[in-house]
Amino acid sequence: MTPTGAGLKATIFCILTWVSLTAGDRVYIHPFHLLYHNKSTCAQLENPSVETLPESTFEPVPIQAKTSPVNEKTLHDQLVLAAEKLEDEDRKRAAQVAMIANFVGFRMYKMLNEAGSGASGAILSPPALFGTLVSFYLGSLDPTASQLQTLLDVPVKEGDCTSRLDGHKVLAALRAVQGLLVTQGGSSSQTPLLQSIMVGLFTAPGFRLKHSFVQSLALFTPALFPRSLDLSTDPVLATEKINRFIKAVTGWKMNLPLEGVSTDSTLLFNTYVHFQGTMRGFSQLPGVHEFWVDNSISVSVPMISGTGNFQHWSDAQNNFSVTCVPLGERATLLLIQPHCTSDLDRVEALIFRNDLLTWIENPPPRAIRLTLPQLEIRGSYNLQDLLAEDKLPTLLGAEANLSNIGDTNPRVGEVLNSILLELKAGEEEQPTTSVQQPGSPEALDVTLSSPFLFAIYEQDSGTLHFLGRVNNPQSVV
């Protein structure tokens, strides 16, 4: 169980190169040429050969209409099939998108904490957040389109179409990023990683979505659910209907907000992410065990444990340690533990920033007996709150030009990102005592029984799929 290092080193080199050219928190110099409109596309956009006809629109069916549930096995198989067909340029484009998504994810993770959402823990999916922003970019016109591209840390030159992001290329690359995560190869008996993304477009009655916009979102995920319902008469009831719909369609035990929607909204854009991974070689320990929330408070939680060869190192200067646990051939779980619980905020600020991967060392794997809580993390946040914290409260507000979304400019209410992340022990039985091979070094005991940070990383594209902190395994984030 050893995560490979070549792809990681290449990614670190790319990020070091990029970071060295960074001005402040924003980046304006990397070409990202594979993500821009090319000259021929720009010629068609600027000089259409035929007269532009009014775009076709449709009114979403009512939310109570009968709907088939999401089939996660089908979604997984579609991702695997698409990933197996990726060509070299597709992989390069995926790596470019991953790099930008990581950087935007770090900034928004910081906003998530500053908005006060990190008190009980935190979780954020950079690709899902990035996909949400790019979806709005596709639905926007200037000046909003340029403002969104600037938020995405990609330079735009006024009047230069070839400096504009091609949103279709970006969404397709984000789907490739998902495919590279779940396509792990290996033996057929290996439990696959599952990641499903669903988008709900909830509209007020009478609001008509453009077919072209919805079809573009299918590049990101085929699990699209445009639905209409009354958002103004009883906002609390509207929220309850949306939550019931999501539970019925997905079966996921999400942390869905109970607050009422804004009465003047005509569009809610909600993204739901479900990740499920199996930690091979781990088993659940009997009973429950103490997890210290702070120096004086503990809770009793289920724990899992396993012994294997993992990369592990300790940073004595900054007082934290890192353990890398493979989740597949190319996916790795990074577990970051401060040596002192009170240092969690400081270590988080030090680690979860643009140069995260430069902190990752590459020591030889060693025998580790790792024990940690069984993780089932639910989190939800409103992107509008993060934009407000980032001093962009009106970016998706009433003045935003989002007329490529529907027949009229929508009034965007909540923009939710909801996440359910499950990491469970493998099914194989483990011996009650560790079998020590003659002459082999004794396994180092590493126990995460106090707050820690985590990230899930896929090495081929260099994507950080999840960033998070666990303050209390029993709390909903």
Swiss-Prot record:
Record-level Gene Ontology MF annotations: receptor ligand activity; serine-type endopeptidase inhibitor activity; type 1 angiotensin receptor binding; type 2 angiotensin receptor binding
CDD domains assigned to the protein according to its UniProt record, in alphabetical order: serpinA8_AGT
Locations listed in the record: Secreted
Maturation and modification: In response to low blood pressure, the enzyme renin/REN cleaves angiotensinogen to produce angiotensin-1. Angiotensin-1 is a substrate of ACE (angiotensin converting enzyme) that removes a dipeptide to yield the physiologically active peptide angiotensin-2. Angiotensin-1 and angiotensin-2 can be further processed to generate angiotensin-3, angiotensin-4. Angiotensin 1-9 is cleaved from angiotensin-1 by ACE2 and can be further processed by ACE to produce angiotensin 1-7, angiotensin 1-5 and angiotensin 1-4. The disulfide bond is labile. Angiotensinogen is present in the circulation in a near 40:60 ratio with the oxidized disulfide-bonded form, which preferentially interacts with receptor-bound renin.
GO terms of biological process kind: adenylate cyclase-activating G protein-coupled receptor signaling pathway; aldosterone secretion; angiotensin-activated signaling pathway; angiotensin-mediated vasoconstriction involved in regulation of systemic arterial blood pressure; angiotensin-mediated vasodilation involved in regulation of systemic arterial blood pressure; astrocyte activation; blood vessel development; brain renin-angiotensin system
Residues glycosylated per entry: 38, 319, 401
Disulfide bridge map: 42-161
Keyword Secreted: yes
Cleaved signal peptide residues: 1-24
Any one of the GO CC terms: extracellular space
InterPro entries: Angiotensinogen, Angiotensinogen_serpin_dom, Serpin_dom, Serpin_fam, Serpin_sf, Serpin_sf_1, Serpin_sf_2
Keywords carried by this UniProt record: Disulfide bond, Glycoprotein, Secreted, Signal, Vasoactive, Vasoconstrictor
Keyword Glycoprotein in annotation: yes
A Pfam family assignment: Serpin
Family: Belongs to the serpin family.
Protein task: Essential component of the renin-angiotensin system (RAS), a potent regulator of blood pressure, body fluid and electrolyte homeostasis.
Protein name according to UniProt: Angiotensinogen
Taxonomic source organism: Mus musculus
